[in-house]
Amino acid sequence: MWGFWLLLFWGFSGMYRWGMTTLPTLGQTLGGVNECQDTTTCPAYATCTDTTDSYYCTCKRGFLSSNGQTNFQGPGVECQDVNECLQSDSPCGPNSVCTNILGRAKCSCLRGFSSSTGKDWILGSLDNFLCADVDECLTIGICPKYSNCSNSVGSYSCTCQPGFVLNGSICEDEDECVTRDVCPEHATCHNTLGSYYCTCNSGLESSGGGPMFQGLDESCEDVDECSRNSTLCGPTFICINTLGSYSCSCPAGFSLPTFQILGHPADGNCTDIDECDDTCPLNSSCTNTIGSYFCTCHPGFASSNGQLNFKDLEVTCEDIDECTQDPLQCGLNSVCTNVPGSYICGCLPDFQMDPEGSQGYGNFNCKRILFKCKEDLILQSEQIQQCQAVQGRDLGYASFCTLVNATFTILDNTCENKSAPVSLQSAATSVSLVLEQATTWFELSKEETSTLGTILLETVESTMLAALLIPSGNASQMIQTEYLDIESKVINEECKENESINLAARGDKMNVGCFIIKESVSTGAPGVAFVSFAHMESVLNERFFEDGQSFRKLRMNSRVVGGTVTGEKKEDFSKPIIYTLQHIQPKQKSERPICVSWNTDVEDGRWTPSGCEIVEASETHTVCSCNRMANLAIIMASGELTMEFSLYIISHVGTVISLVCLALAIATFLLCRAVQNHNTYMHLHLCVCLFLAKILFLTGIDKTDNQTACAIIAGFLHYLFLACFFWMLVEAVMLFLMVRNLKVVNYFSSRNIKMLHLCAFGYGLPVLVVIISASVQPRGYGMHNRCWLNTETGFIWSFLGPVCMIITINSVLLAWTLWVLRQKLCSVSSEVSKLKDTRLLTFKAIAQIFILGCSWVLGIFQIGPLASIMAYLFTIINSLQGAFIFLIHCLLNRQVRDEYKKLLTRKTDLSSHSQTSGILLSSMPSTSKMG
């Protein structure tokens, strides 16, 4: 509509302009001046209009005067171009672009739009201008092949068709089989132009039933060919369905000799498989059967499932321990050693295999070795092995090794040529040279003396046996030297059972019945020998005697004698051998003789009374009856009790009293709640440790039969007594802190220490000491005569070391405590210091010496002339330590006595709970809780 008014405006303007130009002409005609004839009267882009007496200028359409007037005159005014595109209402309309030109404006349609004429429009033209959307999709080829064109306002877009993807400016076919997971498992994807399809693999079919499908909604399922066609593999084979296929195979235990194509009917026949190629376990044999097999363990092995024949691959063949099943597998006097699948027989020590006997299965024969050689003795003793190792280079073993080697030289002469006669005279002379080294013998340790004594006795016995087995010209001999006498007899004639053989040497005699000669099963001509040693009783004396009567005075009162017989059997005879031994000194009426034999099984050799009995004893002789050939001596036990026995009685009586008192103290500390506090708990731990240590000491100190159990007992005693001393140290420290707290205000109090920390100290440190001690010297626990720490190797210091340290600390702390207590008592008023409780307090303070173990220092002073007095004091005080604890902490504690009275009289008077100064050293009241 606005275009119409614009045209109308232009029409009137033209008419006006025309009128204005015609009037001047008329004026000129009428005779006036026409200024408009001068073309410079008006500026450029203006029209001049003449009036009757003047003129005026008007800017052309699309221009405005610089002074803003429509009609103007005069110079200086210009007509300036008007930018119609900047007007508020766009002259071109929507979807168009306005371009200003001189005096006018040009309208152009935006990209994607077009006017009705398809051309630009100049403002002022007669026709209307309207930009309409252009549908580019109507243009052929504007989008590439396999794409769709979509028109939009002012534009368009191209989209590839389904199954195609854009590659640059063209649409290419998309291979869905490569770019996407479009088919299910066990299916094959096939690509087509713009699409795809899926087919199941051979032997499978789709769940939808069709041959082709798209997407994952369907799945490929296995076709069971074996169930659809039962004759697929034929009558002799087994059809096995597999995923997507099937196979034909032979039954278990059979195989097809020719190659079988998977999934095809089998040709040929199935043959039996020999499964015995690496099928059965180790130590077994395999037996093949038609279609199967079974395993059987080798002799000496048994299956783990107990079956004779088996097929289970998890079954193993385990070795049979024939030695455990039958202890007599190898026969008498033998040792059975199990090996995989079998066993080995060997002879016991002092026995050897009989070369004349049968060595068949279960018929192994061992006969006794008639005499020992150096190799046999070396194996019996660690002392000798050590001596052989150092070869005399160690000065500490020089004397011992010298005597050992001298004795072995005698034995080597006997053993080197067992078929040659042995000279008893020469051997006796050599033995005398060893025995005459009395000074050297007395310098040896107890273990070395017993070891050397054993070697010497065994050497003499072996020499006598060798002389009897291969006699020289003299069938019976009598050898006399300064240090030993020997009488030997070879019995060439038949010895009747009721007869006996008498041998004598240095006043000692041995009577051997002929029945013993027969029982001994002699090889060749039987023979017996008897030896009596001079001065050997001073070396192998009563200190090597271990017996429960050691509390009586003992002394050796005979020479050491020995007897032997050529037979294999040397002990457990049906009738005894009679030994008559002459006394070195007359027997006293108060003395009782003990017939002892040298036992090499106890340590390296000890005198023991087992196997022999006293038949009769006179002032000059003792007759012994023994059931074996042995080395014997007579030990006299005096009727006078030794100091050790008195100490033994005192120790045991005092220990029993202490146990009773400790039990009462433990019950008091546990059950009397009124006296329970920080200190009584410490007393309780000390009492428990002492109670356990003393009761184990009473019941287990002499349990030496089992060395392993004895070592365990010794280890527990070590720990318990150490725990006692560590708790004594805790008591001493706590007592000192408590007394010092009375003197100094706000001083560190014993109540500030938690009980858990004290328990860790009192029980933990002893464990650490025992573990370290056992690691350093595992054999230090247990001795031959008591279950305690070894006192001969220095191992006892693993106990004495900590004990001495604790005694020293406790003594210093106790002295300091008494000094502080004395200053405290002197500082109070004279009236208070004269109270009777002061005397009680002082007594209880001094009694702490016994409670805290300080009295153990008496054991160190058991030397010199005061040794016996110190021994009695030490035994009495320390055996009654439990009684002292009960006396100080219970009976002399008024609060505890009140609790005892209440318990006995069943009264419940609560007024008796008064505190007195007597509790000061036994149980300081504490309101703090236990840590």
Curated annotation (Swiss-Prot):
Membrane-spanning intervals of the chain? 645-672, 680-701, 712-735, 755-776, 793-821, 840-859, 875-897
What does the UniProt entry say about where the protein is found? Cell membrane
Q: Which residues lie on this side of the membrane: Cytoplasmic?
A: 673-679, 736-754, 822-839, 898-931
Tell me the GO BP annotations in alphabetical order.
adaptive immune response; cell surface receptor signaling pathway
Question: Which superkingdom does the taxonomy of this entry point to?
Answer: Eukaryota
Q: Which Pfam families match?
A: 7tm_2 (PF00002), EGF_CA (PF07645), GPS (PF01825)
Q: Provide this UniProt record's keywords sorted from A to Z.
A: Adaptive immunity, Calcium, Cell membrane, Disulfide bond, EGF-like domain, G-protein coupled receptor, Glycoprotein, Immunity, Membrane, Receptor, Repeat, Signal, Transducer, Transmembrane, Transmembrane helix
- Name the organs or tissues of expression: In macrophages; but absent from those which are localized within T-cell areas of lymph nodes and spleen. Low level of expression on blood monocytes.
Q: Give a GO cellular-component term.
A: external side of plasma membrane
Q: Which SMART domains match?
A: EGF, EGF_CA, GPS
Q: What happens when the gene is disrupted?
A: Deficient mice fail to develop peripheral tolerance after inoculation with antigen because of a lack of efferent regulatory T-cell development.
UniProt-annotated glycosylation sites, renumbered to this chain: N148, N167, N229, N269, N283, N405, N417, N474, N498, N706
Q: How does it sit in the membrane?
A: Multi-pass membrane protein
Record keyword rRNA processing present: no
Signal peptide start-end? 1-27
Q: Where does the record place the GAIN-B domain?
A: 482-642
Q: Does the keyword Acetylation apply?
A: no
Misc:
Most adhesion GPCRs proteins undergo autoproteolysis at the GPS region of the GAIN-B domain. ADGRE1 is predicted non-cleavable because of the lack of a consensus catalytic triad sequence within GPS region.
Tell me which family the UniProt entry assigns to this protein. Answer: Belongs to the G-protein coupled receptor 2 family. Adhesion G-protein coupled receptor (ADGR) subfamily.
Q: What is this protein called?
A: Adhesion G protein-coupled receptor E1
**Organism, as annotated:** Mus musculus (Mouse)
Gene it is expressed from: Adgre1
